[in-house]
Amino acid sequence: MVASRAIGSLRRFTASQTLRCPGYICRNFTRSSALLTRTHINYGVKGDVAVIRINSPNSKVNTLGQELHSEFIEVMNEVWSSSQIRSAVLISSKPGCFIAGADINMLSACTTSQEVTQISQEAQRTFEKLEKSTKPIVAAINGTCLGGGLELAISCQYRIATKDKKTVLGAPEVLLGILPGAGGTQRLPKMVGVPAAFDMMLTGRGIRADKAKKMGLVDQLVEPLGPGLKPPEERTIEYLEEVAVTFAKGLADKKISPKRDKGLVEKLTSYAMSIPFVRQQIYKKVEEKVRKQTKGLYPAPLKIIDVVKTGIEQGSDAGYLSESQKFGELAMTKESKALMGLYRGQTLCKKNKFGAPQKEVKHLAILGAGLMGAGIAQVSVDKHLKTILKDASLPALGRGQQQVFKGLNDKVRKKALTSFERDSLFSNLTGQLDYQGFEKADMVIEAVFEELSLKHKVLKEVEAVIPDHCVFASNTSALPISEIAAVSKRPEKVIGMHYFSPVDKMQLLEIITTEKTSKDSTASAVEVGLKQGKVIIVVKDGPGFYTTRCLAPMMSEVLRILQEGVGPKKLDSLTTSFGFPVGAATLMDEVGMDVAKHVAENLGKIFGERFAGGNLDVLKQMISKGFLGRKSGKGFYVYQEGVKNRNVNSDTESILASLKIPSRPDISSDEDIQYRLVTRFVNEAVLCLQEGILATPAEGDIGAVFGLGFPPCLGGPFRFVDLYGAQKVVDRLRKYEAIYGKQFTPCQLLIDHASSPNKKFFQ
């Protein structure tokens, strides 16, 4: 679902030229304009098997766009019309990617649902021809096979896949707010059964090749090859092609049957699905679960259920028509535009726009073996980075090392790693109490307590032992990097790398640069973050940077709303029903009252009244009683091991009651409470762009969604302003400003967008 890049190029032939390659039984290629202009696909013939190679130019992946689709139709028509060809193999020339899905830019360019429906119907017709082909077609899958790529593969008569970690099959369209639009909603249930098909399409979950084989999604597996005269990726593709050609010949000769024998469980499932009452119960249960999980905020899952149901109950023709129509409708929804915008932003934030650093970071050192330090260590050794984990305390160091091992061992339990791979990765970690080995470090990341004097102390100690090229990064969430760098002998090598907890699960990394930070230091930080698998935003230095600065005023409003008498459970319900993955009161417990108070006091001193809201005495009293949040077992809720339905902490309710403030009925409806929270967040985000803290709106959206849990269905604060309307946001702010003053005063950039309706953050 992203753009693509070529590894090879198409050869041109005159009418008399033939393709002569080892292992080929060749045929003549006539010169034609279609052949000469083909850039995404080329093919040759091995015996009587056409080997069709997909290799889109200028990208690491193949995507199904208009050009590739047109070329594919041309090639298949040649294959079907040739008497010398009895079968075909579809394979990608790109290592690690079969087809990553449809080109979402093609969908974004459409202005009506009818245009999108037409694209769907064209793809449906093409894949129907594949499905009904009298010449067997084998899909040889190596790497990602997603979305339209999967729909293409399941239209073929046979599928062979490499048993490699990079080979993943899936239908992730729901994550973009759409549904499989090239026949996937109709073929997938028939191939793997309705329950498994629903699971794939409603979650967007990727399926590994070995599991795909058990499900019936793949017919045969091929072991990847190791290094030889050629790189392992190249050897694997060549071997996969050889195996696929053999199976294609076997299918054409009727020596291999494309029909797979179903196991007992599959037979029982098929029988159960033949009973109307059972089917209706399954539809009902799945729909109930979807409504509960999505809270009605995402239309795509319910449409997927509807389309699958139509195909099963009314037949394939009705199913395909419903699929194409619903595909068109969904592509025009605000939710889909928001999710596609996030996808594009995520793609941009996975690139190093600062170029390659002068020296690759091969040796990493981390100061502090606490929750954050150990988390950073885990995502580093996990990616084969040699890592030193240092702490001043032996027990703390032991806990940190154990946390890293546990994280790796969890992957063994989930069969993502073998025990040998776990031990090999863990061997990249060295735990120590001193600075031995720091003279080889290419980067040091400090993750010590949020206290400026302590950070100054470790910075001075580190600079006494590290080499000149070494970058010093601070994992601070709010302390200005320029203040940390004030004691540095080399401020150009000091940078901020703000990770989010838990580090192994949170995708975002916020990198903070000062006026003195060099471009090379930034490039090094981005390179390390990308190795760790992070989505990266780069922001300028300032109090709270971007993420903490946006979250702080919203948390201040949370505190005020709680003081006004809205209970934690009610507030959580209001925020999750708006699209936040975690309720506001629960989020406070996750952050911790001590951290929340520390940030609120520091940023409050700097930003003044704009960051005011609830009374910090609430937090102070909670801290004094040990109610720090989840980490202490009590916060707004009481936390017990294994208990999902948490009770509200009655002692905290008493504190809130003692500090209760009157609510205003005109701004205290459920909707007003939701918008009081969201507008403070959005206004601060736009102000960060106005002040140059943020470089782009896209990075602002990515930071808010992946770091702070801003509702994905809204696309981030900037996409929200575009889709909801800047004027409506300003009107909301003015309404609350009349009561609370500067805390809700809209920033100038937001006012500018409101006064010019055509002015958008995303054109």
Curated annotation (Swiss-Prot):
Recorded metabolic or biological pathway in which this protein acts: Lipid metabolism; fatty acid beta-oxidation
Active site: E510 (for hydroxyacyl-coenzyme a dehydrogenase activity)
Matches recorded under Pfam families: 3HCDH, 3HCDH_N, ECH_1
Modified sites of kind N6-acetyllysine: 46, 60, 129, 166, 214, 249, 289, 295, 303, 326, 334, 350, 353, 406, 411, 460, 505, 519, 540, 569, 644, 728, 735, 759
Modified residues (Phosphoserine): S316, S419, S650, S756
Alphabetical list of InterPro entries matching this protein: 3-OHacyl-CoA_DH_CS, 3-OHacyl-CoA_DH_NAD-bd, 3HC_DH_C, 6-PGluconate_DH-like_C_sf, ClpP/crotonase-like_dom_sf, Enoyl-CoA_hyd/isom_CS, Enoyl-CoA_hydra/iso, Fa_ox_alpha_mit
Catalysed reactions listed for this entry: a (3S)-3-hydroxyacyl-CoA = a (2E)-enoyl-CoA + H2O; a 4-saturated-(3S)-3-hydroxyacyl-CoA = a (3E)-enoyl-CoA + H2O; (3S)-hydroxyoctanoyl-CoA = (2E)-octenoyl-CoA + H2O; (3S)-3-hydroxydodecanoyl-CoA = (2E)-dodecenoyl-CoA + H2O
Keyword Transferase: yes
Record's keyword annotation contains Lipid metabolism: yes
Lineage top rank: taxon: Eukaryota
A single BP term in Gene Ontology: response to insulin
Site description Important for hydroxyacyl-coenzyme A dehydrogenase activity, residues in chain: H498
EC number(s) reported in the record: 2.3.1.-, 4.2.1.17, 1.1.1.211
Residue range covered by the transit peptide: 1-36
GO MF annotations in UniProt: enoyl-CoA hydratase activity; long-chain fatty acyl-CoA hydrolase activity; long-chain-3-hydroxyacyl-CoA dehydrogenase activity; NAD+ binding; transferase activity
Positions of the record's site feature: Important for long-chain enoyl-CoA hydratase activity: E151, E173
Similarity-based family: In the N-terminal section; belongs to the enoyl-CoA hydratase/isomerase family.
Quaternary structure and partners: Heterotetramer of 2 alpha/HADHA and 2 beta/HADHB subunits; forms the mitochondrial trifunctional enzyme. Also purified as higher order heterooligomers including a 4 alpha/HADHA and 4 beta/HADHB heterooligomer which physiological significance remains unclear. The mitochondrial trifunctional enzyme interacts with MTLN.
Name assigned to this protein: Trifunctional enzyme subunit alpha, mitochondrial
Species in which this protein is naturally found: Sus scrofa
